[in-house]
Swiss-Prot record:
Keywords: Cell inner membrane, Cell membrane, Chaperone, Disulfide bond, Electron transport, Membrane, Oxidoreductase, Redox-active center, Transmembrane, Transmembrane helix, Transport. GO terms for molecular function: electron transfer activity; protein-disulfide reductase activity. Required for disulfide bond formation in some periplasmic proteins. Acts by oxidizing the DsbA protein. One of its GO terms (biological process) is protein folding. This is Disulfide bond formation protein B. Disulfide bonds join 38-41, 104-131.
């Protein structure tokens, strides 16, 4: 069956399942494989969680209004683009030589206790902590590279569900 012809609800719930699966795998790697997430990884997880919630709400609400569907598609697309930016920054940090970037030094829990939310966000994006380490690879790509791939795929799915033309029944058959 062609996934491009699935209903709005089925496509949104598929997006939700992908986000849930990606988050479940990240938690599995943390709890059972011992891979501790860096602050940029945590921000990517938050972006996947927000994407999943948006897909779930869109799928459960299943509006027949064209403008509501476009709004959902646009929100999903923008959230995925933000996630792509965070993952892109993480990939950039990993590809830079380790001695050229300063370390942010503190874990995210400490930063959130001592700074405001915008300062934490700025500090995490400008520093590296352990974000430059590549501890996991699959098919030659690191975790942030795979995250970037999935963010782009989910952004395209958001555009598809929000802006695909509905088949219209002929007026006279």
């Amino acid at each position: 069956m062609n996934a491009l012809q699935w209903s709005f609800r089925a496509q949104c719930l598929t997006g939700f399942l992908f986000c849930t699966g990606l988050l479940a795998y990240a938690i599995f790697l943390q709890l059972h494989q011992g891979l501790e997430p860096c602050p940029l990884c945590i921000f990517q997880r938050i972006a996947f969680a927000v994407l999943g919630i948006l897909f779930l709400i869109a799928g459960l609400y299943n509006s027949s209004n064209v403008y509501t569907r476009k709004a959902y598609g646009l929100l999903i697309f923008l959230t995925a683009i933000i996630g792509t930016g965070i993952a892109g920054r993480h990939v950039w940090v990993q590809l830079m030589p380790h001695n050229t970037i300063s370390s942010c030094g503190s874990p995210l829990s400490f930063l959130s206790e001592t700074m405001g939310p915008f300062e934490v966000f700025r500090t995490v994006l400008t520093g590296t902590s352990n974000c430059g380490n590549i501890d996991w690879r699959f098919l030659g790509l690191s975790m942030p590279m795979w995250s970037m791939f999935w963010f782009v795929a989910l952004a395209l799915l958001g555009l598809l569900v929000g802006f695909k033309a509905e088949r219209r029944k002929p007026l006279f058959s």
